[in-house]
Amino acid sequence: MRKSLLIIGLTTIACLTPAHSESGMGWVSYPGGEGPGKGKHVVLLAGDEEYRSEEAMPMLAKILSQHHGFKCTVLFSADPDGTINPNLGTSLGQPEALASADAIVMSLRFRKWADEAMKYFDDAIQRGIPVIALRTSTHAFQLPPTSGFKHYNQFGKKVLGESWVTHWGKHKAEATRGVIESANRENPLLRGVTDVFGDSDVYEAYPPADAVILLRGQVLKGMNPADPAADHEKTRATDKQKQGVNDPMMPVAWTREVKNSSDKTNKILCTTMGAATDLASEGLRRLVVNGVFWGLGLEIPVKAEVTPVGEFVPSKYSFDAFKKGTQAADYEPAK
């Protein structure tokens, strides 16, 4: 993996036909087709202020749609005129798309959706559909006390397996190398997953005993894939004891199967990686795609196709650094 992946665009080998993509106020949809995902609808939720989920989710949606046959709909936070605005935490475009979701891929942070939008999300969860959750989704919601769904403020801890704790690696200074958990290296979710790297930092995280750890995050001394492992000490937030920052390494990807209040089971894949720049890593993209297959009970390919459809040049993560004036239609393939 080379740093140049973050600088140059990644393009597909073949030219794919985008004839039936659609978009509207705060949403874009890509058609399903032939492939293992035929007849399945994946809804991807983009809504965080820092890590450019509004760029990452359309890229993942196009991979799932064009390479694997899933119908995919991306829902954004947007201003009333449809301009994408990740800072508008109360907004979710076309939440009714969740009514037909077979799986959710989410990259959210402190959303404050109205009860009408939360009802669609809650209904989807209660149906027992799988959830693939990235980065700040551990703290996806910050609903007000008046919300009928305020219990979702605990969604990270109770469902995904962890909430926000703190940055474990130094933010914007120590990148992450994904290290496969040796005890679970034969897990089907790890098929084709190699050389995972992200230039976002490791989060402090302690998933519960029922979680199956897939990857741990090695904190690096710098921001490049070839940098050596960091060797300083860090104080844990939980018990205030010091440990080597990589001894042990924090989990950065795990699965759970969680029974909800409707007595249905949600299959969960959570990763604390997932900035748009992290998803320049082929291995991390493949883990997310494998998660969709696993969640839906589909056979996970030996090496799933995860080449971006068209150009993918992820913006560097930072608050208020989103591309101004962008509409959902801008994420439709060129016609």
Task: Please report, for each region that a protein language model flagged, where it lies by residue.
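Active-site rim elements
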Residues: 47-50, 169, 173-178, 190, ...
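Helical hinge/lid and interdomain linker segments adjacent to catalytic or ligand-binding clefts
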Residues: 28-30, 34, 43-45, 49-140
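Extracellular ligand-binding/catalytic regions of CAZymes and related secreted enzymes
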Residues: 22-37, 55-56, 66-67, 223, ...
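Bacterial N-terminal signal peptides
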Residues: 7-17
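Short glycine-/acidic-enriched loop or helix-start segments at secondary-structure transitions
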Residues: 54-55, 115-117, 142-144, 201, ...
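Positively charged n-region of N-terminal signal peptides that target proteins for export
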Residues: 1-4
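An acidic, glycine-rich "communication" segment
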Residues: 38-39, 134-233, 304-335
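Short, solvent-exposed loop/turn segments at secondary-structure junctions
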Residues: 49-50, 111, 138-140, 218-222, ...
